[in-house]
Amino acid sequence: MAMKSLSFLAVLSLLALTLPLAIASDPSQLQDFCVSANTSANGVFVNGKFCKDPKLVTADDFFFSGLQTARPITSPVGSTVTAVNVNNLLGLNTLGISLVRIDYAVNGQNPPHTHPRATEILVVEQGTLLVGFVTSNPDNRLFSKVLNEGDVFVFPEGLIHFQANIGKAPAVAFAALSSQNPGVITIANTVFGANPAINPTILAKAFQLNPRVVMDLQTKFKK
């Protein structure tokens, strides 16, 4: 009896340790697919989205067109991201993956940011990029590499990373992310463009800056 109790406790402990790993990413699907539906009509509620009735699903629900064309670059950082996720490709719902195209102007960058729910794997299609990510505290170690056409680099989930065009011509990259909705937290926009604004005194102390400099940055990033 004592041995059975010990075995039960061992199994229970193992489950307790593995459960956080099991829920650390998008949940596994319980059916072949769950095409997201915009309304509850003819649908069921699964994983945060209404699922379209499988009998009404068509090939178009798994199709997106648009990554073949570069979008205009109008951002001050000199890059444009075209995302394909569950919001514009409904068939991605529950499948745990998404895709982006990133266009970089000369000297443009995709500034330091994180994806709170996804690992990213990036391949350069055109140009030369300087890429990198920084590990968590206390080491804050930088892993950086220069990528040319056809080169691939991985950014671990949740870590701050960036890409910068260091070539003499525009650059293009494609990236896959391990979530249907990976999320993006751009560090500068989040810290200095928070709504409502973070108290400048707090940021001045955190960044060792004059409060006036912080207020100037907050003005620049104000939405």
From Swiss-Prot:
| Glycan attachment residues as annotated in the record | 38
State where the protein is found: Secreted, Extracellular space, Apoplast
Pfam families linked to this entry? Cupin_1
Looking up PROSITE patterns in the UniProt record yields: GERMIN
- Which keywords does UniProt give here? Apoplast, Disulfide bond, Glycoprotein, Manganese, Metal-binding, Secreted, Signal
The name on file for this protein is Germin-like protein subfamily 1 member 11
Summarize the subunit comment.
Oligomer (believed to be a pentamer but probably hexamer).
Q: Name one GO cellular component term.
A: apoplast
Is Glycoprotein one of the keywords? yes
Q: Which residues form each disulfide bond in the chain?
A: 34-51
For whether the record's keyword set contains Manganese, the answer is: yes
Query: What Gene Ontology molecular function terms does this protein carry?
Result: manganese ion binding
Where is this protein chiefly located? secreted
Question: PANTHER family, from UniProt?
Answer: GERMIN-LIKE PROTEIN SUBFAMILY 3 MEMBER 3 (PTHR31238)
